[in-house]
């Protein structure tokens, strides 16, 4: 038998690879070059064919007829239009396509939807996808309308959307896009200026659908609830999305997760949204969310929860920056309500305002929130609880946190209302009760962004003895950086607790009383008002009578100066001989 030439064998392998994933018999069909209309091309096409559409406006009801086809506007959506002309139909229909189909490169406009089972209900103004596997890319859905899914409605399908724009569409549910059952992955797309009279101005998903949203923008959308988006009995993920300038008359200006929804959420920018409750986000009715590494800023609630409105959930909010939000009633930053135990960790809650109470946070009606390593700073209210307010059987636990520089008519830092109780564990707080063993008031030394300075009293004052403490801070810095965890959302380098060497009584000057304090500490077991490390004039790691003698020598005989920090207060720079634990205010 003769052997095949190697060159022919290689050519055969190359051709096989190039044709892989597409039927070798598939054809490209040109519109209008070969066929006058898209539907004429569909009628004769077979599974796997591509219909390549030249620039122009096509007023057709494009029905894939159950075929696995790619319909492509070859010059893109700027030049290729599928126009429903306001007829009572969707512009495009994909139904019962079990392998895959694709729509790419079109502006789909002026559609009105088709009947979708319920009386007087129309679905998918621009595109309807039913029981199909479909890919939609590089398309714009413009000025379509229907009952569900003004731009696109997907039902019991697996749909992938990328590089698309949903602009100025309208529906009762899901102005830009709605998904009922099945799955939807949407990436690098925009929902802009869509409107819903009901749920989800930009995007609605329900029916236990699986939703994954990546790198998308939801801008200037409006709805009754969930101005930007509304997830109800859905699961999945949202990541790296901009949610800005959306509006809801009820809950969730930026977006609303409700009715047993379960989502992993990260990297959101939720900015300048408005709603009655939950100007930025609403999380309600037994949803379970893990929201991390996001910014919630500049949102407004006409009632409760300027940044986030949390109602009956067990969600986790971690590494969030909740800043500059406002509420007309309670909870400028966060409003946590009713019989849940949300977890708030490594969060910066800064510069929020509520008119009535709880400028930073309000906890009400039996909620048992847990705050771990949070900084609640510079919030305000005209009522009680500039930092945090609890009332009506609420029982928040606050661990390793800072409550500082908040402002209120009464009870500026923390306000405990009727039938409420706080559990405070290692908290630096304005207005701290000196009788509270694990709470203290010293200068947190925070900058305008909530970061502690090198002399902050929050440094090294945290406890490790609490279950489930986060491993890193809000910026991903490992904890601890010193001997113990720092309080608040940020972990700082060093050991904090600046002092003046030789200032044994902590009055920030070196005088004869410091020598007497050393002697009292050594011979009468008296406490020092400063930290013991400051009493160690020689910085040799021990407090002895020599330290008292050297203080006297410096004062009266022009003797040698003490070791650093001197002559100005600062942190200990010699960690070999330091006793930073002697400066701790709170025990373990």
Where are these regions (language model features)?
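Bacterial N-terminal signal peptides that target proteins for export
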Residues: 1-10, 20
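C-terminal segment of classical bacterial N-terminal signal peptides
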Residues: 16-23
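Right-handed parallel beta-helix/beta-spiral solenoid domain characteristic of secreted/periplasmic
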Residues: 33, 68-118, 432-433, 440-445
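N-terminal extracellular ligand-recognition/capping segment immediately after the signal peptide
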Residues: 34-39, 47-70, 76-80
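Predominantly extracellular beta-rich ligand-binding scaffolds that present long acidic/polar faces
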Residues: 61, 65-69, 135, 156-165, ...
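Right-handed parallel beta-helix
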Residues: 102-203, 207-224, 237, 246-249, ...
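C-terminal accessory segments
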Residues: 435-491
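Cellulosome-associated attachment modules in secreted, modular CAZymes
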Residues: 468, 494-588
């Amino acid at each position: 038998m003769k052997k095949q030439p190697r060159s022919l064998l290689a050519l055969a392998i190359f051709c096989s690879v190039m044709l892989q994933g597409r039927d070798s018999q598939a054809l490209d069909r040109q519109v209008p070059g070969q066929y006058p209309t898209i539907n004429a091309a569909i009628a004769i096409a077979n599974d796997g064919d591509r219909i390549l559409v030249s620039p122009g406006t096509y007023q057709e009801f494009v029905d894939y007829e159950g075929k696995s086809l790619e319909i492509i506007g070859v010059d893109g959506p700027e030049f290729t239009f599928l126009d429903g002309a306001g007829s009572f139909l969707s512009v495009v229909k994909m139904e019962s396509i079990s392998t895959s189909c694709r729509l790419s490169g079109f502006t789909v406009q002026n559609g009105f939807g088709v009947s979708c089972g319920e009386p007087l209900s129309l679905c998918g103004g621009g595109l309807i996808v039913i029981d199909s596997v479909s890919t939609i890319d590089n398309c714009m859905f413009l000025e379509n309308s229907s009952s569900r899914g003004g731009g696109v409605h997907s039902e019991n399908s697996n749909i992938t959307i990328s590089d698309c724009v949903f602009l100025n569409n309208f529906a009762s549910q899901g102005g830009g896009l709605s998904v009922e059952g099945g799955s939807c992955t949407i990436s690098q797309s925009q929902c802009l200026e869509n409107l819903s009279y009901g749920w989800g101005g930009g995007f609605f998903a329900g029916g236990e659908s699986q939703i994954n949203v990546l790198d998308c923008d939801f801008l200037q959308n409006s709805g009754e609830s969930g101005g930007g988006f509304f997830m109800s009995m859905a699961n999945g993920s949202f990541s790296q999305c901009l949610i800005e300038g959306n509006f809801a008359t009820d809950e969730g200006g930026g977006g609303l997760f409700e009715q047993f929804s379960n989502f992993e959420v990260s990297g959101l920018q939720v900015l300048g949204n408005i709603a009655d409750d939950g100007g930025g986000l609403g999380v309600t009715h037994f949803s379970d969310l893990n929201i991390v590494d996001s910014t919630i800023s500049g949102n407004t609630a006409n009632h409760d929860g300027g940044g986030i409105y949390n109602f009956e959930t067990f969600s986790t909010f971690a590494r969030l920056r909740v800043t500059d939000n406002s509420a007309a009633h309670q909870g400028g930053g966060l409003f946590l309500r009713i019989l849940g135990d949300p977890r708030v960790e490594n969060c910066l809650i800064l510069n929020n305002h509520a008119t009535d109470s709880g400028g930073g946070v309000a906890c009400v009606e039996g909620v048992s929130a847990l705050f771990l390593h949070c900084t609640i700073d510079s919030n305000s209210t005209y009522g009680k609880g500039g930092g945090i307010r609890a009332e009506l059987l609420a029982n928040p636990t606050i661990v390793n946190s800072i409550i500082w520089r908040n402002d209120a008519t009464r009870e500026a830092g923390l306000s405990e209302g009727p039938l409420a109780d706080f559990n405070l564990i290692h908290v630096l707080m304005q207005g701290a009760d000196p009788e509270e063993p694990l709470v203290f008031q010293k200068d947190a030394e925070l900058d305008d962004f909530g970061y502690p300075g090198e002399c902050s009293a929050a440094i090294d004052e945290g406890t490790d003895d609490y279950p489930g403490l986060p491993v890193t801070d809000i910026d991903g810095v490992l904890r601890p950086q010193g001997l113990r965890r720092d309080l608040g959302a940020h972990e700082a380098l060093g050991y904090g607790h600046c002092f003046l060497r030789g200032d044994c009584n902590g009055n920030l000057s070196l005088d004869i009383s410091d020598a007497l304090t050393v002697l009292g500490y050594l011979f009468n077991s008296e406490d020092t008002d400063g930290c013991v490390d400051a009493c160690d004039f020689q910085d040799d790691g021990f407090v002895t009578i020599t330290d008292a003698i050297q203080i006297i020598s410096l004062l009266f005989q022009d003797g040698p100066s003490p070791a650093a920090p001197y002559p100005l207060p600062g942190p200990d720079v010699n960690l070999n001989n330091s006793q930073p634990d002697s400066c701790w205010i709170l025990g373990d």
